[in-house]
Curated annotation (Swiss-Prot):
Its cofactor is Mg(2+). SUPFAM superfamilies: Nucleotidylyl transferase. Belongs to the bacterial CoaD family. It holds the Pfam family CTP_transf_like. Homohexamer. GO terms for molecular function: ATP binding; pantetheine-phosphate adenylyltransferase activity. GO terms for cellular component: cytoplasm. This is Phosphopantetheine adenylyltransferase. It comes from the Bacteria. It is found in: Cytoplasm. ATP binds at residues 11-12, 19, 95-97, 105, 130-136. The gene is coaD.
Length: 166
């Protein structure tokens, strides 16, 4: 039997407990999960690509234990379906917080299925405890000196505190 690889794309700027929740679900479905950090030239991320890789890898080690070794973090600047193919994925993972996410993700899944019928999109609903968490809100709270510890892994909370106290 061949290993099943899933591709989980996002900006992860920063990684949140919501992302980790989806990642845990993805690890139930796949042997390996490739976390694809989308690089968009028009966007100015808070954390550099290298910082995001380090934060994801450290968070996975701290929060997922041995399962953290089943993830791989990569960058991509092309279509997500092309990135998934390059990394040998047969599944694309998408997290859902609410109906707004579902509407958008269904549209994207339909387009992706037309262009890459061999890739299966799997929607994983967020656990109730993380449904309200967004990276945008986390950045806003951190930028105003608020406590983001309930919303992100400890290593990310420390990095945000450092970033905004500089």
């Amino acid at each position: 039997m061949t290993d099943r690889t899933a591709f989980y794309a996002g900006s992860f700027d920063p990684l949140t407990n919501g992302h980790l929740d989806v990642l845990k679900g993805a690890l139930e479905l796949a042997d390996t999960v490739v976390i694809g950090i989308g690089i968009h030239p028009g966007k100015k991320p808070l954390f550099s690509y290298g910082e995001r890789v380090a934060l994801i890898e450290r968070s996975a080690k701290d929060e997922l234990g041995a399962d953290g070794g089943r993830i791989k973090v990569v960058a991509f600047d092309n279509l997500v379906i092309d990135a998934a193919r390059v990394h040998g994925a047969s599944i694309m993972i998408r997290g859902l917080r609410d109906g707004t996410d579902l509407d958008y993700e269904m549209q994207m899944a339909g387009m992706n299925q037309t262009m890459a019928p061999e890739l299966l999109t799997v929607f994983l609903p967020a656990s109730p405890s993380v449904r309200t968490v967004t990276a945008t809100l986390v950045r806003q709270i951190a930028s105003m000196g608020g406590n983001v510890a309930p919303f992100v892994p400890a290593v990310v909370a420390a990095a945000l505190k450092e970033k905004f106290s500089a």
